[in-house]
Design a protein with these regions (language model features):
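Bacterial N-terminal signal peptides that target proteins for export
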Residues: 1-8
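C-terminal motif of bacterial Sec signal peptides marking the signal peptidase cleavage site
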Residues: 16-19
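Structural recognition of beta-strand segments within beta-rich domains
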Residues: 89-116
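C-terminal low-complexity, charged extensions that often adopt amphipathic alpha-helices
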Residues: 144, 148-183
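N-terminal leader/targeting segments and the immediate start of mature chains
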Residues: 21-94, 291-301
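An acidic-aromatic
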Residues: 106-160
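Extended beta-sheet lipid-handling architectures
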Residues: 78-83, 94-96, 111, 122-126, ...
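Gly/Pro-enriched, hydrophobic low-complexity segments
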Residues: 5, 22-26, 174-287
């Protein structure tokens, strides 16, 4: 059994979150006003320069559109879903999977070919990644930033990406009170939402259709190089659920190393706010391997 056929798509999707970092770079959205005050004494002349920054207030229309987008994201505490995952390429591969989430706490992905036997498991708790390879009895236990080329990531951002929800890095899921933190542009009937504060080295934005259904997430490195990749996620099949709008189909294109990678996720159903079990235990007879072995574990051997 080739684990690459089943688990690598999930790893690729997590890698979307390479945009998440610890250093913010503000996009110019402000006006600077400089005032100078001069104080003179018999011996000393002091000049003090003070710079104040004023953020441009969002328009009424922008506030309205952002509120409609944000209000489409309903509240939830837990999630269980079935589905399938496939990799594009010369030989498309697919597998059934089960997904469980506890909001803001954990993600559990069980890879089950034919929907029967679990061959691999990926668990993220907080900012820690656990990958269990059941066929070869080995595991990886590392920081979740292993999936994002060393850039910090947390489980909440991953959950938003999996469900097709806009977010502002460092502030969480987009809500109606965040209109002043984003810019909104109507481009040929498509609403583009772009956080004013971008993270160092990357830029990201979200696009929604006229019904406020998410269409895409784009994460682009500021400086193009072989060490960083552009991540694009296309969403479709948006449906209304107990937790608001949810994209049931997710299609991602990126790179793993220098190799192009495409991914399709198709959710078959959602169950909300019921008790879920997240198994993050490591079997006692399994061998730990280093994070640098990640792609080697899930190779085509």
């Amino acid at each position: 059994m080739k684990i690459a056929k089943h688990i690598l798509p999930i790893i690729a999707l997590s890698a979307i979150t390479a945009s998440c970092g610890s250093q913010k770079v503000a996009v110019p959205e402000t006006q600077k006003v400089t005032t100078t005050t001069t104080t003179t004494t018999t011996t000393t002349k002091t000049t003090t320069t003070t710079t104040t920054t004023t953020k441009a207030a969002p328009t009424t229309a922008q506030v309205s559109h952002v509120a409609k987008i944000a209000n489409s994201f309903g509240a939830w505490t837990t999630l269980k879903a079935g589905g399938s995952v496939s990799i594009g390429g010369s030989k498309p591969l697919s597998s059934s999977m089960q997904i469980r989430m506890e909001r803001g706490k954990s993600i559990y992905i069980s890879v089950r070919p034919m929907g029967i036997m679990e061959v691999a498991r990926l668990v993220i708790v907080g900012d820690t990644l656990l990958v269990i390879d059941k066929l070869h009895k080995r595991y990886i236990l590392e920081s979740a930033k292993l999936l994002t080329s060393g850039i910090p990531i947390d489980v909440s951002t991953l959950q938003d990406i999996f469900l097709g929800r806009a977010f502002i890095l460092g502030n969480g899921t987009l809500n109606s009170g965040m209109a002043s933190l984003v810019t909104l542009a109507n481009i040929d009937g498509t609403y583009m939402v772009r956080p004013k504060e971008q993270y160092k080295g990357f830029e990201y934005d979200f696009k929604f259709d006229k019904n406020y259904h998410i269409k895409s997430l784009e994460v682009t490195p500021v400086v193009k190089s072989e060490k960083v990749a552009t991540y694009s996620v296309d969403y479709s099949g948006v449906k209304t659920s107990l937790a608001g709008y949810i994209a049931t189909k997710v299609n991602m294109a990126t790179k793993i190393g220098k190799s192009p990678m495409s991914l399709a996720l198709d959710y078959s159903g959602f169950t909300w706010n019921e008790r879920v079990t997240i198994d993050a235990k490591i079997p006692s007879n399994y061998t730990r391997v280093s994070g640098s072995s990640l792609l080697g574990i899930f190779s085509e051997e």
